[in-house]
């Protein structure tokens, strides 16, 4: 099984796209210093379970692309590590070194590793998913616990979380969200993303975002409904 010169898949055309660092944090949280063998086994086991003939593991190459759009992107994360002890710093360095070892092992076994300067793993995933028909890809499985990847879900694109051990697909979408899949971007715009330091509407979190979508519809519907007469300040902020 290999890519042809045209970049298309031959033989088994199902594709596994792995959020490389996201999956590695599974061992970071368990404080396991040496996890290369387990990491490789996990990836190959998932490829077998989902009958994927090609595996692409994605790595973050920085956030330049996103920071050019929004300079405050992830600015809140600097404080997270400023009070680290020397022992904690060494532990994290060991984690990253083992992550590099795992990547090399996977590459030596013939799996694709993709990392591009200025782009994060989900930027690359979005590009690959967008090009999947050109590459002759059949079914695609995204391996990440990051729910932002759900923006990519389609009839032939699904996500599996190694943290919750649950799948998110177009067929079980309503088990995970209280709004239709095409409202996912509206949800993110309203609620923002505190982890990435991206503000949403003042006073609007996930629950209130769901309520607004249920009552008014997508972002354009909400915009067209403004100004909305309400006693609630978060609605007045719209």
Features from the language model and the residues they span:
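Domain-level signal for Mg2+-assisted phosphodiester chemistry and nucleotide/NA-binding surfaces
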Residues: 1-109
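Extended two-metal-dependent nuclease catalytic cores across DNA- and RNA-processing enzymes
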Residues: 2-7, 13, 80-238
